[in-house]
């Protein structure tokens, strides 16, 4: 296919969890000269495959995903690191004469890529230690941020301690909220970006799809996967990796803090909340092409290709 005439093209494939984003991305490789980049804050971790629903070994062998399996679960990975890494990968793919195709459901990462990060104060060890201690008080960080910066609070889950701590840290160090600092940002990407989002047919369908995925996850040995992490000894449930949905709930089950049934129900509840959060992001997202879900990836791919063809592409 021919590239867009002026700027290099980048494709975003977004959507709530369990809507077939990865399958669509793989299918598009039949029609477009694309390279895939994962945009998922859970898929970055090695040894966390079942609970994150990573593409199969066969799919990854035939359709490699960049920014996948790049961190050990004990390591942190900031939005700034993602921004740096993804821009590097995008430029490398463009130099190969191909189109970068970003696929995943981490809406905050997409937002960082599109709008950038303001020049933010570096982390302060003493302040961070204080905020970490306060994180043990139920909802303290979230309530505090809601008073200081309600816009940022609306975009951060109340249990996402890493982002809550960073947002509060920025305010205490700079005297300005994260939202205020972002408004001063003149960041703009030098690409022609086509954004697509798979939209589920209805809430009931998505809820059923999520429950089926979690049942499959447990059948595939998710408990054993978390047990291996649990027995390492260097991991704990306040790490970003173990706070990933499913892992935290299974971790607490292994600590005898809830029953198997409670663990299962909590994973379902947390996953449904995530999907709702993702859909809220997408509802207010600008310049997005929404495509209705279809069980056949080829039909979804055709919808993507139709949009591209209308914008001076020849496929």
Curated annotation (Swiss-Prot):
Superkingdom of origin: Bacteria
Region (Interaction with substrate tRNA): 40-43, 162-166
Class of this enzyme: transferase
UniProt-listed Enzyme Commission number(s): 2.5.1.75
Keyword Transmembrane set for record: no
Subunit structure: Monomer.
Name assigned to this protein: tRNA dimethylallyltransferase
Organism: Buchnera aphidicola subsp. Acyrthosiphon pisum (strain APS) (Acyrthosiphon pisum symbiotic bacterium)
């Amino acid at each position: 296919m021919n590239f867009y005439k002026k700027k290099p093209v980048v494709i975003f494939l977004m959507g709530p969890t369990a809507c077939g984003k990865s399958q669509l991305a793989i299918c598009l490789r039949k029609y477009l000269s694309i390279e895939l980049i994962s945009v998922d804050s859970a898929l970055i971790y090695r040894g966390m495959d079942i609970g994150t629903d990573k593409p199969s070994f066969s799919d990854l062998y035939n359709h490699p995903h960049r920014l996948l399996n790049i961190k050990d679960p004990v390591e942190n990975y900031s939005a700034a690191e993602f921004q740096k890494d993804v821009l590097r990968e995008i430029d490398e793919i463009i130099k190969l004469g191909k189109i970068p195709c970003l696929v995943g459901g981490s809406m905050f990462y997409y937002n960082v890529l599109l709008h950038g990060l303001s020049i933010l104060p570096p982390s302060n060890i003493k302040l961070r230690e204080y905020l970490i201690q306060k994180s043990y008080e139920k909802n303290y960080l979230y309530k505090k941020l809601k008073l200081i910066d309600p816009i940022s609070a609306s975009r951060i889950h109340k249990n996402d301690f890493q982002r809550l701590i960073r947002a509060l840290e920025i305010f205490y160090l700079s005297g300005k909220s994260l939202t205020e600092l972002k408004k001063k940002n003149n960041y703009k990407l030098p690409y022609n970006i086509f954004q697509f989002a798979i939209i589920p047919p209805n809430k009931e369908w998505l809820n059923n799809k999520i429950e089926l995925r979690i049942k499959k996850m447990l059948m595939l040995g998710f408990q054993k996967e978390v047990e291996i992490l649990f027995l390492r000894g260097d991991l704990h449930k306040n790490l970003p990796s173990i706070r990933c949905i499913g892992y935290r709930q299974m971790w607490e089950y292994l600590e005898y803090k809830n029953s198997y049934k409670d663990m299962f129900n909590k994973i379902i509840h947390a996953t449904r909340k995530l999907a709702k959060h993702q859909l809220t992001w997408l509802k207010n997202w600008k310049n997005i092409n929404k495509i209705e879900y279809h069980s056949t990836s080829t039909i979804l791919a055709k919808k993507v290709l139709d949009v591209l063809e209308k914008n001076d592409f020849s496929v």
